[in-house]
Amino acid sequence: MVGAGIAGLSAAMAMRAVGCRVAIVERDPEPAPDVDHWRRSGVPHAVQPHFLMGRLRSLFLDRYPGLFAMLREEGVDEIAFADYLHPLARTRYVPKREDALLTVIASRRTTLERTMRRFVHRNSMATIIPHTTVNKLLLAEREGTPYVCGVETRTEGSSRIIPSEIVIDATGRTDALARLLASAGVESNTEHFPCNILYFTQWFRLRPGKTFPSTSGLPGQIFDDFVIGALPADNGRFTVTLQVHRDDTELTTLAKHPETFREFCRRLPAIAPWIDPDRAEATGPIYGFGMMDYLWRSWVVKGEPRILGFFAVGDSVIRSNPRFGRGCTWAALGAHLLADVVAATRDPRLRLVRYEKKLRNTFRKDWMTMLAIERTTQRRFQIAVGHTPATLRDRFASLLDRCLLESLIADPAVFRAVWSGYNGFARMSSWTTRFDIWARIIKRSMVGPGELSNLINQLRTRPSRSEIGEILDRFAIFSS
C-alpha cells in the first residue's frame, strides 16, 4: 500500500480482513500527539471540510464496530436525519426505519484519519512505514503484460526494496504512482475534467457552554456566483467554507483575508450565527485549496489490462468536486470492493477487470451526475456575472430549483428522497425519476412559499456585487 490516508487505511483494513499481510508506505511523518496540531502536509485538503456520508457510517458499524466506538470516544458526533429537518417539516415528519441509515458522521478529516490509524495499529492490520517515499515501481512481465511486483522506497537517503504480490496506489490527487507507470511506458485510460472552483475555509471552535446553531438541511446558502456553508465536526469544531469560481477576482480576493471573509459571512443569514464572537472563535488562518478536478482512471482498455498486480483506490482512481462529499466514503467502499475481488480469485487479469467493473457499476452514474451538475454550475456563474445570456431553458431550471428548495424545507418525503442519494443509499438522480416526488414538489409550488417566506428570503439575502466591492474598499483590499 502506498499512502496512509483514508483510502490507504481503508484498503489495509479491507485487505487484512481477507487474509492479506499489509505494509503501508507513507511519505509524511508520524501524526502529532494532538490532532489540533497535526498538519498533514502530504494531503493539503485535509484541513478542508469533509462530509462523511451515512453510507460510510454504515460500513464502519457493519464491519468495524470497534472503530466506530473509538471515533465516539474521540468526540466524533452523529447528526440524525431528523436533525436536518426544518421545524415546519418536523411537524409533518413520520419516521421510517431507513431514516436511521441517513445519519452522518461529524468529524474533522484529521480526527477520522488518526483514529483509523490507531485502530489499524491496535488490531495489527498493517505495518506503517512513515516518512518514506516510493521512487520506483518494480516491474516484471507476465504473458506480455507489465506486472508490478513491489516498490523501491527511500527513507532519509536510504533505499529499500519491498517485494509484494500486489501494490495498491492510495497516493490520492498527487497521481504519483500513475506518473511512475507513465514514465515506464504504461499509460492509463484517463477521463479528466478541470473544476473551476476554489475553496477558502476557516476553522472555528465553540466557546464553553455554546452549541451549534439550529439549522435545516446543510447550513449554508447557494448562489450562482458562490456557495458558502458551515459544517459541524468533532469536539465543538466546525468550518465555514466559501466556494468561489477561479476567475472571480473580487470574491477570490475577499476570501483570502480574514477581515473581509468574516465581514462577508456576517452579511449572510445562514452563516452569521455560526461566527458570532459570543458563540465561537476562529482557531486558525484561512486555508485555500484549488487542486480539484474530475477524474476517472482505468487500466483496462478494450477488456485487456495494461498492468497487472497494481490497483488504485480513492482519489487515485476516481475524483470529483469535494462539495459532493464523495471522497472518503467512495475511498472506503472502493477499497472493500477491491478486497472482495482479491479474495475471490488469484488470476491477476481477472482481478483488475472485475475490480474496475465493480467500480463502474457502483460509482459511474453518480460521477456522471456530479460532472453534469459541475458544468451547469459553471454556466450559471457565467450568466451571473454577465458573460453569457440566460436562455429560456436556464430560466426554467432556476424556477425548478426554487420549487425544489421549498419542498426540501417543507416536505420530509422530498428531503428523504434527495438525502438518500446524497448519503449514498440511492443514485443521486434517483429522486428525479419518481413521479410521487415530482407530484409533491408541484403541489408545494402551487401553494406558494406561505409560511416559508421569511426563510426563503433569508436564504436569498446576500451582499450584492457592488457591496462586495465596498467590503474590499472598506478594508483597503483591492482585487487585481
Feature names for model-found ranges:
Residues 339-480:
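C-terminal helical "tail/cap" subdomain of flavin- and related membrane-associated enzymes
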Residues 51-52, 99-118, 170, 176:
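Short beta-strand to alpha-helix junction loop
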Residues 1-30:
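N-terminal Rossmann-like FAD-binding beta1-loop-alpha1 element of flavoenzymes
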Residues 122-264:
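Predominantly flavin-linked oxidoreductase catalytic cores and closely associated redox partners
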Residues 89-109, 113, 148-150, 243-247:
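Helix-loop-beta segment of a Rossmann-like dinucleotide-binding subdomain
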Residues 106, 250-337, 341-367:
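FAD/FMN-dependent oxidoreductases across multiple families
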Residues 14-18, 34-87:
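N-terminal FAD cofactor-binding segment of flavoenzymes
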